[in-house]
Amino acid sequence: METLSQDSLLECQICFNYYSPRRRPKLLDCKHTCCSVCLQQMRTSQKDVRCPWCRGVTKLPPGFSVSQLPDDPEVLAVIAIPHTSEHTPVFIKLPSNGCYMLPLPISKERALLPGDMGCRLLPGSQQKSVTVVTIPAEQQPLQGGAPQEAVEEEQDRRGVVKSSTWSGVCTVILVACVLVFLLGIVLHNMSCISKRFTVISCG
């Protein structure tokens, strides 16, 4: 298999959608990877799943679905890294008996415990009462590593964000100093031009 960049590891090379709990990275017998949605669409038109790159056949026993193919562990290791986000997704159960994943801010003042009732604003200025539902770690989709590793990765990510913010501030200050210096040179030259007919030279 050819070497892929990390960005291409994050997306299905057929539909170019990012892998997610709905679009799981499935490993074919030929060791190529594509999302479960694309494989399901291929399976509806064919009896077996044929790799779009090498044409290798991945046979599924009768009654088996694409979801029972193994996930690609290399891709899962890449996409399990938390991405920069100000909110942590929390599963909530709405009164309409649907289950949604909404980003709820985590703060001590506004935190909801499992089973607590609360009210959250949804798009379109709608208010819905919600009940927080916790999902055991072993049932959460696409979670990799132990909770301690996740905490360490989050701390590393925050360190990178703080570092990049600080370097951005330093860059702005440096550019401002250079501009002030150049403005001083221009003003000095302008004052010398206005005095060129005097005996005093600007040096």
Curated annotation (Swiss-Prot):
E.C. no: 2.3.2.27
Superkingdom of source: Eukaryota
Role: E3 ubiquitin-protein ligase that acts as a negative regulator of mTORC1 signaling by mediating ubiquitination of RagA/RRAGA and RHEB. Catalyzes 'Lys-63'-linked polyubiquitination of RagA/RRAGA in response to amino acid starvation, thereby regulating mTORC1 signaling. Also mediates monoubiquitination of RHEB, promoting its association with the TSC-TBC complex and subsequent inhibition. Also mediates 'Lys-48'-linked polyubiquitination of target proteins and their subsequent targeting to the proteasome for degradation. Induces apoptosis when overexpressed.
Transmembrane as UniProt keyword: yes
Self-association state and partner proteins as the record states: Interacts with RRAGA (inactive GDP-bound form); stimulated by amino acid starvation. Interacts with SEC16A.
Membrane topology term: Single-pass membrane protein
Pfam families from the UniProt entry: RNF152_C, zf-RING_5
Pathway as given in its UniProt record: Protein modification; protein ubiquitination
Annotated segments matching region Necessary for interaction with RRAGA: 106-165
InterPro entries found in the cross-reference section: RING_RNF152, RNF152_C, Znf_RING, Znf_RING/FYVE/PHD
Family membership noted in the UniProt record: Belongs to the RNF152 family.
Organism listed in the record: Homo sapiens
GO cellular component: lysosomal membrane; lysosome; organelle membrane
Record's subcellular location: Lysosome membrane
Name assigned to this protein: E3 ubiquitin-protein ligase RNF152
Post-translational modification: Ubiquitinated. Autoubiquitinated in vitro, leading to its degradation by the proteasome.
Transmembrane domains' residue ranges: 167-187
Tissue specificity: Widely expressed.
